[in-house]
Amino acid sequence: MRQLRALGIAALILAAIFPLQSQGKKTVLQYWSWDSSVKKQNEDIIAKFEAQNPGVKVELTTLETTEYWVKIRLLANQGKLPDVFNMSSGYLEEWARAGLVRDLGPSIDRDLDKKSFYMSVLDAGKDIAGTGKYCALPYALVTTVLYYNKDMFDKAGVAYPSASWTWEDFRKAAKKLTIVKDGKTQQYGFWFFGRYSNVESWVFANNGRLIDPATNSYKPDANAIEAMRFLTDLVLADKVAPAKKEMSAFRYQDVFPQGAAAMWVDGSWFIDNNRKIAGDKIRWDIAELPRGPKGDGKSVYGWPDYVSISPNTPNADLAWKFAKFVAGEGVSLDMYMAGKIPTYRPITESPAFLEKGQQPANKGLLIKQAAKAFRTSYTLGWSEWRGYGPAESLGLNGIIDAIIDGETSFDEGMNKADTNINKILKRYYK
């Protein structure tokens, strides 16, 4: 962290050393993207931008996510960041505190068409950055939803989830949807494990929090504890959801579309996966999460993907103009996999976004959620303490998995989480 901060200062010094980047008479912008699946769409956006801005050349670098973060961190350490680059919610605070992203607040105040963007999403980024500044411009967001198998609901005679569902309604439905024959469970009512999007969705639906923002410490409140106990009880007491180890034959995202469970809570981006895996073999839809006993329904668990601007770009105004274009009027719906929500409202609120005739029929729910306040648990070191990606078996993810796998008690797991996670956070927030 201190290394990145020092290098952020170095980057500003380098800005005074290196002259305006040019190619002949053209002003050159460097744009880095982590998504090779939309390389062609990005090239189309760039072509439109260049046509509207004669004398400008945008050079695109596209890398897969893992390689992207390795290489862009190297550039940050060298003070050679591209003018505009993709930024993740999971790393925004680290980069903002290190001074490696430009403060966009003055530009947003000056000429961003706020009516055309979901400002709640921009505000979420401001909160995640932890600096009180807008350090990135969101171009897409995701939320979490309740996926449910309509065929299984119909067969069990259970009414589809509604906005009035309570946690007890959910539990009762999960029990009716669980099928046991000869002592073996053939179909579960629900599926989850310690994954962040599986757990925090319920924490926030109960108006809970995991992180104390005043101390940057892991200190789950009573509402969060209630949510995590509710989830683990679905496995250990109600027997309506499996232990994680029981589903080891599946990719976690395939348990629901392959028909092993009737309900599942995860990111809206899995709409795309469900379509590919399930096809037309099952009828399914999405609903909002049941509101917890302490929930008020005013916020939703969700987070954006962004573009950020280098603090030492010699072309700050032009970089801002391009960032607005790539997050707004320059994009088209085919830039987004099903389930990702454009932050540019004219696209999201167009009839094409609803994809009538395709599952899920209730895709309009995502538009309603985009207008709500967003909550997350992102901090410095989030992937480490949460147990994300390569660290999945560690952190809170691993602890919750151990609870539902019967390897530790709930109270023992919560105590372990408190000790281990706060050791990690203390390293980052000194």
For each predicted feature, which ranges?
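C-terminal capping/gating helix-and-loop segments adjacent to ligand/active sites or protein-protein/ligand interfaces
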Residues: 129, 364-420
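Hinge/lid segment of periplasmic solute-binding proteins
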Residues: 89-145, 285-287, 357-362, 369-371
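Short, well-ordered beta-strand elements
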Residues: 25-36, 56-61, 84, 135, ...
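A structural signal for short loop-to-beta-strand junctions that line the ligand-binding cleft
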Residues: 74, 83, 112-152, 188-189, ...
